[in-house]
Amino acid sequence: MTLKKTYLWFIIVMLCNLNLTAQTTTARRSSPLTVAPPLSISLSSERLERIDSMLKQSLRDNTIPGAVALIVRNGRIVFHEAYGNADANGKKLQKDAIFRIASQSKAITSTAVMMLWEEGKFRLDDPISKYIPEFKNPEVLVNFKYADTTYTSRPANKEITIRHLLTHTSGLGYGVIDGDERMKMLYHKAGTTDLFTTEPVTIKEVVMKLAKLPLHHDPGEKYTYSMGLDVLGYFIEVISGMSFEAYLQKHLFEPLGMDDTGFYLPTSKGDRLVAIQHKVNDKWENYPNTFYDVNYPIKGAKTFFSGGAGLSSTAKDYATFLQMYLNGGELNGIRFLSRTTIATMMANQTMDLYGNGDQHYGLAFGVLTEQGQAKGGLGSTGTFVWGGYFNTQYFADPKEKIIGIILKQTQGSTGDQTSWKFKQMVMTTIDD
């Protein structure tokens, strides 16, 4: 074989290998999100105006400083509005404002995990120690001394699996926001980084520390909100051979057109980041730095890729991601997930360990049950939902093909009722 033919063969093989990974093309071709009049997709304009009035009234009542709200049906944007201010200095909020979405990152991380699962890279019930050996032989916390943080532990009765990490049943904790003071103290002493940071820390370094700490309980025994999705961010690096940030950029954000979503923002987009605000004597003020620097998306080392809480995004970008799910895993002729995989992700993965029966928990999604639907105002059975630490929320109803997103950036108690009102009122706009 000549050198030229050898080179051509090499190129062909490489191209074939590229097509066998992550997202693939499909004969089905759903369009990117476009704007349409409400009546064209059977939503009531008058009832959408009620939502507009409710949000404006919330500003007058001073329960929120600002919000961006977006409603999509059948892949068409029928409502996309910005209200109030982006900071305490009176800067007007814009529709393309960028928000810290915190735990809404979990759905994106879960999606990336399942894209690799579709390639046959692992099984959901594989022990995580098969890929991250430091998690071998986990221990469960037994006794703890508050005076000096010494503790005793016992061997866990089973290994932590990938499914456990996706469903918050691994027994891992959540450091500074953990509900157990003992875990807060242990995580702090170990120097784990939770949620967000501007320090030169990597997710690998944090995961290595997590692996040495005791668990809340035996894996699979309880639902305990945790850093499991952060562990899976590093797991994606191990499996893919890419940084977690690069994997998401190449296989999700770029092909979906989510141009304003990422762990960190370039300087050119820094002025679009909404300030976090809190109430002081009934007046909105910019939130100060506490256990985290509020400007983490635009300053610092920019090396910590938190799969559980680290992303920032816009309402339209996140709606695009959710629309891919409502399309059965496809958008614009690109297939990201099979509809059969999505069915697995939305199935009850934790049985009766999660919630009060109104929702079950899938693979990083809360999913509305028949009992929840019967209570009203929450969507159809199968509607999937979640939110973020800074007062962001989303829901997507596969039956009615509706997406609702409301994004704010607040901390502390404010009297805000816009989230439940928004969801309830969106569902009443259906006019078919």
What is the meaning of each model-derived region?
Residues T410-K421:
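A short acidic/glycine-rich loop-to-helix N-cap element
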Residues E139-T381:
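Short, surface-exposed loop or secondary-structure junction motifs
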Residues V68-L70, H80, R100, H164-T167, ...:
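Structural recognition of the beta-strand scaffold that forms the well-ordered cores
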